[in-house]
Amino acid sequence: MSPICAICGQGIAPADDSKEHILPNAIGGRRTVNNFLHGDCNNRAGQTWDAELEKQLRPLALHIGIKRQSGKTSRMKVTTTANEDFLLDVGGQLEMVRPVVTPTLLRNDERIDVTAGSLTQARETLKGLKRKYPKVDIEAMLARAESRRSYATGAINIDLSFGGPLSGRSVVKSALALAHYAGLPIEQCGDAVSYLRKTDAEPC
């Protein structure tokens, strides 16, 4: 008897099988199971249910530095109580959303001051400035760059709540995948299976 897909309820042929992370890779999951989801069902759930869960948990994943098995957690824009905009990066680090370019007209020439969140951002900014100011020597300016550490003036307010029909199904799918990994037939988990297969099912 062929295994049954937890989402669509159809048999899984060897060619249609897929590796499913018990916890989504996007939030640091490593262990996988087979004979649990069709490849198509796996992809659809990943693009909807798991994507929503990752979006809701991204602030926490960035703050504590979750390492994915593959890929990298995307930075996210945050605003402080002082209305400062930053990008939250891995480990809770903050980076400027956009660089600040300040041209100053001197007696014989024009001076350009660039404040950027990283050397990479500074380099990209200087490349853009070179189109307007061809005499800009990117490498010379980077060699004279000064590194300074500064802190946000305001506090960052991050919503760590999660739930809803999409991320909720991702959580239930993980619980069902763990049961499958432990050798429990998924059809014995009636409420969980019903929740994954029926859009109007009651949350379990």
Positions of PLM-derived features:
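Short, extreme N-terminal leader segments that mark the start of a protein/domain
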Residues: S2-I7, I22
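Short recognition patches in nucleic-acid-associated and regulatory proteins
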Residues: P14-A26
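Alpha-helical structural context detector biased toward long hydrophobic helices
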Residues: S2-P3, I12, A26-C204
